[in-house]
Amino acid sequence: MISSRCKNIKPSAIREIFNLATSDCINLGIGEPDFDTPKHIIEAAKRALDEGKTHYSPNNGIPELREEISNKLKDDYNLDVDKDNIIVTCGASEALMLSIMTLIDRGDEVLIPNPSFVSYFSLTEFAEGKIKNIDLDENFNIDLEKVKESITKKTKLIIFNSPSNPTGKVYDKETIKGLAEIAEDYNLIIVSDEVYDKIIYDKKHYSPMQFTDRCILINGFSKTYAMTGWRIGYLAVSDELNKELDLINNMIKIHQYSFACATTFAQYGALAALRGSQKCVEDMVREFKMRRDLIYNGLKDIFKVNKPDGAFYIFPDVSEYGDGVEVAKKLIENKVLCVPGVAFGENGANYIRFSYATKYEDIEKALGIIKEIFE
């Protein structure tokens, strides 16, 4: 009785690894901030509850939040996106699903960097699309000429993520502009996952939407404001792309029959996040940077590893000691939880992903264990 569509979806390898862990493991696997949601955001949601804001919101989200998202895009990236071209979603994950399900038919090709966040692959398969990998070099760079060579008449989307999960790579202006030009030249659409746009240490974030209208910009509140459980994200499209495809109305058709709307009182929390002081974000990023430096310095003499530019992941090559699954299992046996790189695509088979979104002291303990095993 189970549909073939469901049967074809593989369980998350990340969750499978977590199931092997015991409660006394040092968790360097989880991809969420260990900080609590800032108090002013919580208080705003409480006020919304007290004021009876517990009913359905408009399908595309409360107007005040969409207006504030529009302001953010203007202030941060000089993008002019009308609030009516924004949908507030149940996390950025729903925004990804809406983008793929709205645009991909059976057999349509989707270009995805490999390794990448696992959902890009699974959602493409769910839509019965065909995955075409964009291979990365040892520094996780994208070869734009190889991207062009991968394009056929069936290619419709490029899914792109900067800062990257799992690599921590922040792509430079030239790469992002180059992808935008490819989208223009080949009539493709870029689905740009920008959920880590504020968690950057040494570089600057650029959005493909700064260089092309053929972009769906996806973001959320989970990573920036430590709001993973709130499930609030959004997508934004240019007026030109929306006029061409009536994209917002088509996405709303899927959204209204699956989720109806994002949780109303949580939307008021997100509104407070954007309107309030951003010091909480600056403080979290400062702490993440300290942890990044700690874990990079601890791993660089053991594994071949690139220093992350953003997000809160580091992705070392462990092939000197075995493949990623073997090394991850050995670490779990020694009470350090990580994720084998193959969970993010076959090109990650020789890697493991550590998250440093955990306490500084726990990272120090984990590094001590790692050194005992591999040095």
Swiss-Prot record:
<keyword id="KW-0032">Aminotransferase</keyword>
<dbReference type="InterPro" id="IPR050596">
    <property type="entry name" value="AspAT/PAT-like"/>
</dbReference>
<feature type="modified residue" description="N6-(pyridoxal phosphate)lysine">
    <location>
        <position position="223"/>
    </location>
</feature>
<dbReference type="GO" id="GO:0006520">
    <property type="term" value="P:amino acid metabolic process"/>
</dbReference>
<dbReference type="InterPro" id="IPR004838">
    <property type="entry name" value="NHTrfase_class1_PyrdxlP-BS"/>
</dbReference>
<protein>
    <recommendedName>
        <fullName>Probable aspartate aminotransferase</fullName>
        <ecNumber>2.6.1.1</ecNumber>
    </recommendedName>
</protein>
<dbReference type="GO" id="GO:0030170">
    <property type="term" value="F:pyridoxal phosphate binding"/>
</dbReference>
<dbReference type="InterPro" id="IPR004839">
    <property type="entry name" value="Aminotransferase_I/II_large"/>
</dbReference>
<dbReference type="InterPro" id="IPR015422">
    <property type="entry name" value="PyrdxlP-dep_Trfase_small"/>
</dbReference>
<comment type="subunit">
    <text>Homodimer.</text>
</comment>
<keyword id="KW-0963">Cytoplasm</keyword>
<dbReference type="GO" id="GO:0008483">
    <property type="term" value="F:transaminase activity"/>
</dbReference>
<keyword id="KW-0663">Pyridoxal phosphate</keyword>
<keyword id="KW-0808">Transferase</keyword>
<dbReference type="InterPro" id="IPR015421">
    <property type="entry name" value="PyrdxlP-dep_Trfase_major"/>
</dbReference>
<feature type="binding site">
    <location>
        <position position="353"/>
    </location>
    <ligand>
        <name>L-aspartate</name>
    </ligand>
</feature>
<dbReference type="GO" id="GO:0009058">
    <property type="term" value="P:biosynthetic process"/>
</dbReference>
<feature type="binding site">
    <location>
        <position position="165"/>
    </location>
    <ligand>
        <name>L-aspartate</name>
    </ligand>
</feature>
<dbReference type="Pfam" id="PF00155">
    <property type="entry name" value="Aminotran_1_2"/>
</dbReference>
<dbReference type="InterPro" id="IPR015424">
    <property type="entry name" value="PyrdxlP-dep_Trfase"/>
</dbReference>
<comment type="similarity">
    <text>Belongs to the class-I pyridoxal-phosphate-dependent aminotransferase family.</text>
</comment>
<feature type="binding site">
    <location>
        <position position="31"/>
    </location>
    <ligand>
        <name>L-aspartate</name>
    </ligand>
</feature>
<dbReference type="GO" id="GO:0005737">
    <property type="term" value="C:cytoplasm"/>
</dbReference>
<dbReference type="GO" id="GO:0004069">
    <property type="term" value="F:L-aspartate:2-oxoglutarate aminotransferase activity"/>
</dbReference>
